[in-house]
């Protein structure tokens, strides 16, 4: 009976470990922030001058992106091209 309990506990732990949601670690954060899935969900915006499309980011521009339009109360219109 004791060994059956150990097997049941191991199976339960494996089940929980394999089925739980993914934990985003700090070193993953940039990957998650810039993932194709996240970018596809973002709203497009027009940069100053209207010649370029940007992407609206609520918490500011990610690394290697540039703020291409000012005047938003909250968030920024950012582009990877502008300012280079």
Curated annotation (Swiss-Prot):
Key word Signal present: yes
Entry's Gene Ontology molecular function annotations: toxin activity
SUPFAM superfamilies reported for this sequence: Defensin-like
Signal sequence segment: 1-21
Tissues in which the protein is found: Expressed in ectodermal gland cells. In adult female tissues, highly transcribed in mesenteries (gametes-producing tissue) and slightly transcribed in tentacles, pharynx and physa.
Keywords (A to Z) from UniProt: Disulfide bond, Neurotoxin, Signal, Toxin
Recorded superkingdom: Eukaryota
Disulphide linkage map: 45-77, 47-68, 61-78
Keyword Transmembrane in record: no
Function: Has toxic effects on zebrafish larvae. It causes contractile paralysis and twitching of the tail within 20 minutes, followed by death within 30 minutes. Does not show any toxicity when injected into arthropods (cherry shrimps or grass shrimps).
Remaining remarks: Negative results: does not show activity on all ion channel tested at 10 uM (hNav1.1/SCN1A, rNav1.2/SCN2A, rNav1.3/SCN3A, rNav1.4/SCN4A, hNav1.5/SCN5A, mNav1.6/SCN8A, rNav1.8/SCN10A, BgNav1, Shaker IR, rKv1.1/KCNA1, rKv1.2/KCNA2, hKv1.3/KCNA3, rKv1.4/KCNA4, rKv1.5/KCNA5, rKv1.6/KCNA6, rKv2.1/KCNB1, hKv3.1/KCNC1, rKv4.3/KCND3, hKv7.2/KCNQ2, hKv7.3/KCNQ3, hKv10.1/KCNH1/EAG1, hKv11.1/KCNH2/ERG1).
Protein name per UniProt: N.vectensis toxin 5
Organism in which the protein naturally occurs: Nematostella vectensis
């Amino acid at each position: 009976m004791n060994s059956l309990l150990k097997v049941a506990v191991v199976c339960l732990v494996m089940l929980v470990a394999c089925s739980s949601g993914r934990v985003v670690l700090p070193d993953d954060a940039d990957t998650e922030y810039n993932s194709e899935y996240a970018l596809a969900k973002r709203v497009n915006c027009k940069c100053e001058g209207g010649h370029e499309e940007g992407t609206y980011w609520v918490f500011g521009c990610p690394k290697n992106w540039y703020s291409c339009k000012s005047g938003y109360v909250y968030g920024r219109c950012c582009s990877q091209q502008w300012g280079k």
